[in-house]
From Swiss-Prot:
BP GO terms, sorted: light-independent bacteriochlorophyll biosynthetic process; photosynthesis, dark reaction
GO molecular function: 4 iron, 4 sulfur cluster binding; ATP binding; metal ion binding; oxidoreductase activity, acting on iron-sulfur proteins as donors; oxidoreductase activity, acting on the CH-CH group of donors, iron-sulfur protein as acceptor
Organism domain of life: Bacteria
Catalytic reactions on record: chlorophyllide a + oxidized 2[4Fe-4S]-[ferredoxin] + 2 ADP + 2 phosphate = protochlorophyllide a + reduced 2[4Fe-4S]-[ferredoxin] + 2 ATP + 2 H2O
E.C. code: 1.3.7.7
Residues holding Mg(2+): 16
Positions contributing to ATP binding: 12-17, 41, 182-183
Name of the featured protein: Light-independent protochlorophyllide reductase iron-sulfur ATP-binding protein
Annotated metabolic or biological route of this protein: Porphyrin-containing compound metabolism; bacteriochlorophyll biosynthesis (light-independent)
Amino acid sequence: MSLILAVYGKGGIGKSTTTANISAALALQGAKVLQIGCDPKHDSTFPLTGTLQKTVIEALDEVDFHHEELEKEDIIETGFAGIDALEAGGPPAGSGCGGYVVGEAVKLLQELGLYDQYDVILFDVLGDVVCGGFSAPLNYADYAVIIATNDFDSIFAANRLCMAIQQKSVRYKVKLAGIVANRVDYVKGGGTNMLEQFSEKVGTKLLARVPYHELIRKSRFAGKTMFQMEDGPEKDECLKPYNEIAEFLLSENPSASVPVPIGDRDIFEIVGGWQ
C-alpha cells in the first residue's frame, strides 16, 4: 500500500523544487517513489529527469483517449535515484478542469496496475488554487504538506489550503503532516517567525526550514536535484531539511492533524505583529 502525499503551496515559492528534493531524499533512503506533477506548466519533475516530459493528456490525445493503447513507458520517465516521474498536464488555457486531468492520470495508473507499486507517491499540485479541481489530489492522499514562505501572501494561501484539507477530511482520510518553511532568510526575511505563529494557530508544525540559497536555484535551472550538485558544506546545509522531511514521512506513524484555519483578519494580526 503506497503512502500518498499531496504537496501544495503558493505559486512561485519553490514548491516543485522542494517536492523533487523530497522525492530524491525518500528514494535515497530506500523508498520506491513516483512524483506526479499536477500543473499545466508540466515542469514539476524537471529536476528529476532533466527534461520537460510528455504529459498524460498529450499521450492520451495521441491515441484519441483510448487508455488501453498506452503503456507505462508512454507516460512515465525514470529519473534520478530511480524515481518515476509523471506529468498530468492540464487542459488548454481558459477551458477544462485541472481536477479532471488529475483523475485521468490516476485512472490510467490504476489501469496499468502501477498505482500500488510504489512506497511513496507525491502529487505536486498547483498551489494557491483550491477549487474543487485542484483539490482533487486530497481525495487520494494520506497526508498533505504545505510549502510556504515567511510572508503574508504565502500564509494567506496556506490558510486557504488548510480550509480545503479540513473540508476534505470530513469524507476522506487526508490530514496535514505540517508546513515546510522554504527560502528561509534570517537576515532579510525574518526567518520563520510568522510561519511559526501561524502553524501554532492552525494546529500544525513546521516540518523543516529550507534555507534561501543560490545553490538551490542553480540546481533547478540545471535540471538537477540538490543531491546531484557538487559536494561541499553549502550543499550539506541545503540537503539537511529534505532528509529530515523524508525521515519523518518514512517513520512508522508520522504525526498529523486536521488543521483549524483562522480568519483573514487573524492573518493580518500575525503579519502586523512582526512589522
